[in-house]
Amino acid sequence: MSRILMSQLTHPQRVRLLYKTILRLHRGLPAELRALGDNYVRDEFRRHLKCNPMEAQLFMTEWARYASTITQQLGIRGKPKGELGEEIDPKTVEMLKDDQVVQLYELMLAAKGVEDAQGK
């Protein structure tokens, strides 16, 4: 069977392929991070089902970058880094919407296993 080029796939097929690839990569994470990551990815992909084309392009680019980063960090291609995650540039945080900052903060707390002030 010949390999299908990404350019031959429809947009929904590319989205599904990226989604499935990320979930497969998460199999290499510790169990608690895998569950957190899988839920987050599922929610984000659902949330962006009906976004405009410009947002969709940015969404796909950023998630493809995430997949590439986690591939390197898990050592699937090349030498493993031995650590997961990366620092977020303060300029990037400044560009986020308020709800995105809250979501990022909640994700950080969940990843560290810390409860917020509301006991969540």
UniProtKB/Swiss-Prot annotation:
If researchers knock out this gene, what phenotype do they report? Reduces the SdhB protein level resulting in an approximate 50% reduction in SDH enzymatic activity.
- Say which domain of life the source belongs to: Eukaryota
Which keywords does this chain's UniProt record carry? Chaperone, Mitochondrion, Transit peptide
Q: Where is the transit peptide?
A: 1-36
Q: Which GO terms describe its biological process?
A: mitochondrial respiratory chain complex II assembly; response to oxidative stress; succinate metabolic process
Query: Does the keyword Transit peptide feature in the UniProt annotation?
Result: yes
One GO cellular component this record assigns the protein to is:
mitochondrial matrix
| InterPro entries to which the protein is assigned, alphabetical | SDHAF3/Sdh7
Q: Name one Pfam family in it.
A: Complex1_LYR_2
Q: Does the keyword Lyase apply?
A: no
Cellular location of this protein? Mitochondrion matrix
Query: What this chain does, per the record?
Result: Plays an essential role in the assembly of succinate dehydrogenase (SDH), an enzyme complex (also referred to as respiratory complex II) that is a component of both the tricarboxylic acid (TCA) cycle and the mitochondrial electron transport chain, and which couples the oxidation of succinate to fumarate with the reduction of ubiquinone (coenzyme Q) to ubiquinol. Promotes maturation of the iron-sulfur protein subunit SdhB of the SDH catalytic dimer, protecting it from the deleterious effects of oxidants.
Task: Family membership, please give it.
Answer: Belongs to the complex I LYR family. SDHAF3 subfamily.
Which proteins does it associate with, and in what oligomeric form? Interacts with SdhB within an SdhA-SdhB subcomplex.
Q: Per its record, how is this protein called by name?
A: Succinate dehydrogenase assembly factor 3, mitochondrial
